[in-house]
Structures are given as C-alpha cells and as structure tokens.
C-alpha cells in the first residue's frame, strides 16, 4: 500500500493517485465539541509541503465516495484504502467519544449513504494516542445503534503516536479488538528516525497467534534510501509525499519480484503469508 500523505484538498486526490498512490491519508480537524469540520493539517507539517490546504469534511467524503464507486465518472480503480488521520490531540480527551459518534454518522451519511452507496474503499481510523480510545468505542457503538454494524468489516484501527506497543495491545484488549489492526511507525519527513520500534512491530506482526498487528507501515518517507530500508525490513505499506518515488523503488531489481501494489482484491486486514 502506497499512502499519499496529507491529501486534504479535493483537487489533491487525483494528483496523488496520478503519482501512483493506491491509498490516501487525510487529516480531520474537530471543533472544541468534537464535531468533525474540515480536512486540514495546519502548521507545522512536513518539509516542502503546504500545510494549509483544506476542504469541508462532508464535501470531501462526497467526492471520495464518487472516486471509489465503480461506474461513477470519477471512479479510480486503484484507490482502495482511506486513512483518516483524526486530530484528536487538539481537543479534550473527554470529547473523544463525541468525535467518534460524529465521524461514524458522517461516514454513514456521506460515504456509505446508509446502504445506498457502492463506494468500496476500506477505512483506516488513525488514532493519535491511546488515551483517545473512546473514539473507537463510540464509532463502533454508533454503527451498531444506527443499524449498520456490518460496516465494521470495512474499518480498521491504527494508533499513530509511536507509543509502547504493549500499551497499545492493552487498549485493544480493553476494546475487545483482535483483528483489523494496522501499526504505524514514523516521524515527519523533516527528521530522521531509527528502526528499533518498526522492527519490534514487524516482529509482533509475524508472531504466530499475535492478533494485535496485521499490517505495518512506515511514515512519512521521501528519501529513496529510507524507502529501500523499510521495504527490506518487510513493511506492508509506505506513507509518502512522493508516491512516484516509491513506485520507482518498487521497480528496482531488488524489489520487483518481492512486492507489488495492493489492489481491491487484497484484504488489508489479513496478515500477508509470503
């Protein structure tokens, strides 16, 4: 999975897909009451990027629904995964539950259209810190209460704050989540990061019977040397400001026979068995 990073303006969706991304990540900004308002990162952000691009969240969902719906004029077959980077660290943890309710309802109304949409992308909920886990509980409660619990099959969980992996496991255990879990490891492209935690996550992913990590991705990679390093370690995905660079690396002799781009037929919740 090649995730286009910080795709917050509607016009950026095609831009990143044209560069080779098959997944996009966008930031969701909330008001003080936990209501999702806009797709927006803000300052600071990655080096060399404009931090202020934005869209109304519901309008963004309406557009991305079309982009991921077969036979729609805007349909792009390659886009199979949407990563929602939830900026919960900007609001009180007490509002995390309200935020989870709101995002679930907006997805129901504007993406899935309560069963009337054929939009097919998988959804990855990126939670910044484990202290905000009530967002996940609220999201699942809302799908159940609204009568659309089946959409849980389309939704995965990912904690992005580089916290202790055992601490993350404990929170997932509290929530009763034993599947559909991704684990991110990374840092803004402005800085270098070692591989110790990334290797630990990959080791846990590959441990038989360990159900708290199904996929691992590294972020935000812009240098080809770091992309190669991550691929050699065996990541499932790369988040990048430059998907075209990832494509070029994947075509190199060392990787061409080991990796391919994920398609809609690849289940993002299953561990890869090579």
UniProtKB/Swiss-Prot annotation:
Disulfide bond residue pairs: 45-51, 47-190
Catalytic activity, EC: 4.6.1.-
Needed co-factor(s): Mg(2+)
Keyword Magnesium in record: yes
Cellular localization per UniProt: Secreted
UniProt record, GO biological process: killing of cells of another organism; lipid catabolic process
Recorded superkingdom: Eukaryota
Entry's cofactor comment: Binds 1 Mg(2+) ion per subunit.
Top EC class for this record: lyase
Active-site residues per Swiss-Prot or TrEMBL entry: 5, 41
Described function: Dermonecrotic toxins cleave the phosphodiester linkage between the phosphate and headgroup of certain phospholipids (sphingolipid and lysolipid substrates), forming an alcohol (often choline) and a cyclic phosphate. This toxin acts on sphingomyelin (SM). It may also act on ceramide phosphoethanolamine (CPE), lysophosphatidylcholine (LPC) and lysophosphatidylethanolamine (LPE), but not on lysophosphatidylserine (LPS), and lysophosphatidylglycerol (LPG). It acts by transphosphatidylation, releasing exclusively cyclic phosphate products as second products.
Keyword field: Cytolysis, Dermonecrotic toxin, Disulfide bond, Hemolysis, Lipid degradation, Lipid metabolism, Lyase, Magnesium, Metal-binding, Secreted, Toxin
Family: Belongs to the arthropod phospholipase D family. Class II subfamily.
Molecular-function GO term, any one: toxin activity
Binding site for Mg(2+): 25, 27, 85
Full protein name: Dermonecrotic toxin SdSicTox-betaIIB1bviii
Gene3D superfamilies associated with the record: Phosphatidylinositol (PI) phosphodiesterase (3.20.20.190)
Catalytic activity: an N-(acyl)-sphingosylphosphocholine = an N-(acyl)-sphingosyl-1,3-cyclic phosphate + choline; an N-(acyl)-sphingosylphosphoethanolamine = an N-(acyl)-sphingosyl-1,3-cyclic phosphate + ethanolamine; a 1-acyl-sn-glycero-3-phosphocholine = a 1-acyl-sn-glycero-2,3-cyclic phosphate + choline; a 1-acyl-sn-glycero-3-phosphoethanolamine = a 1-acyl-sn-glycero-2,3-cyclic phosphate + ethanolamine
Expression by tissue: Expressed by the venom gland.
Annotated organism of origin: Sicarius cf. damarensis (strain GJB-2008) (Six-eyed sand spider)
GO cellular component: extracellular region
The keyword Lyase appears for this protein: yes
């Amino acid at each position: 999975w090649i995730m286009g990073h910080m795709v917050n303006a509607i016009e950026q969706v095609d831009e990143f897909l044209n560069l080779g991304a098959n997944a996009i990540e966008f930031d969701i900004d909330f008001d003080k009451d936990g209501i999702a308002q806009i797709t927006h990162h803000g300052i600071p952000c990655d080096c060399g990027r404009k931090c202020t691009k934005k869209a109304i969240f519901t309008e963004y969902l309406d557009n991305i629904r079309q982009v991921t719906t077969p036979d729609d004029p805007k349909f792009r077959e390659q886009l199979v995964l949407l990563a929602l980077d939830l900026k919960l660290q900007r609001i009180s943890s007490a509002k995390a539950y309200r935020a989870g309710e709101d995002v679930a309802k907006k997805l129901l109304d504007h993406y899935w259209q309560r069963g009337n949409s054929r939009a097919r992308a998988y959804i990855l909920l990126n939670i910044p810190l484990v202290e905000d886990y009530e967002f996940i509980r609220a999201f699942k409660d809302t799908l159940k209460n609204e009568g659309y619990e089946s959409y849980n099959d389309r939704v995965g969980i990912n904690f992005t704050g580089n916290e202790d992996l055992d601490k993350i496991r404990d929170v997932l255990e509290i929530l009763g989540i034993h599947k559909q879990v991704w684990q991110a490891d990374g840092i803004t492209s402005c800085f270098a990061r070692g591989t110790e935690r990334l290797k630990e996550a990959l080791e846990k992913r590959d441990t038989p019977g360990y159900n708290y990590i199904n996929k691992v991705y590294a972020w935000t990679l812009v240098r080809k040397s770091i992309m190669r390093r991550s691929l050699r370690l065996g990541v499932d995905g790369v988040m990048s400001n430059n998907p075209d660079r990832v494509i070029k690396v994947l075509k190199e002799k060392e990787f061409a026979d080991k990796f391919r781009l994920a398609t809609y037929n690849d289940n993002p919740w299953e561990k890869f068995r090579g």
